[in-house]
Amino acid sequence: MSSKYIVIEGLEGAGKTTARNLVVETLKSLGVTDMTFTREPGGTVLAEKLRSLVLDIKSVGDEVITDNAEVLLFYAARVQLVETVIKPALARGEWVIGDRHDLSTQAYQGGGRGIDRQLLATLRQAVLGDFAPDLTLYLDVDPRIGLERARARGELDRIEQESLDFFNRTRARYLELAAADPRIITIDACQPLEAVSHDIRATVTRWVQEQQ
């Protein structure tokens, strides 16, 4: 089977790390052994520096990062990761498992921030062209629950400190985009962990079998 790019998406506290481990475990059980793991923003030396700039609330002192500057920083980190890590890994025949990709920008900056859809579409086309994940698992969680989980982990980053309304708008855009794209599968992450784990394993297994 040819290499594939699988991405895990969701709000803070949705359980992306646990989901990634389940995806990897399931893929290994199906015979997939060569995998590369990425996160966004980040994943390269340059992209990690950009991650720090955009997420670390102390990185720019009292200077306010504008919404447009924020989205451009995300795309700068993304193109560096795609061109230097993801595409080369896929070309080597490896499967790539990503923690976030462009859907995050469409949801957080498009939904949460309210950035113009056409601007985001133009940026996406310029940076990524037709490149997209083969499968995206969107872990849907109520923002209140997700934020409670995130706070329990410790200090929140700049975006995690946004208002509940921001995350409600972000979730609404996630759901809208997921409903419109058959490559995005929504997992109910408000369920007990055992049920979420079952859904992830079943979804990945079914999808891989369909690719054969």
UniProtKB/Swiss-Prot annotation:
It is an enzyme of class 2 (transferase). Pfam families: Thymidylate_kin (PF02223). One of its GO terms (molecular function) is dTMP kinase activity. ATP binds at residues 10-17. CDD domains: TMPK (cd01672). Its EC number is 2.7.4.9. It catalyses: dTMP + ATP = dTDP + ADP. Keywords: ATP-binding, Kinase, Nucleotide biosynthesis, Nucleotide-binding, Transferase. Disulfide bonds: none annotated. InterPro entries: P-loop_NTPase, Thymidylate_kin-like_dom, Thymidylate_kin_CS, Thymidylate_kinase. One of its GO terms (cellular component) is cytosol. GO terms for biological process: dTDP biosynthetic process; dTTP biosynthetic process; dUDP biosynthetic process. Phosphorylation of dTMP to form dTDP in both de novo and salvage pathways of dTTP synthesis. Belongs to the thymidylate kinase family. This is Thymidylate kinase. It comes from Cronobacter sakazakii (strain ATCC BAA-894) (Enterobacter sakazakii).
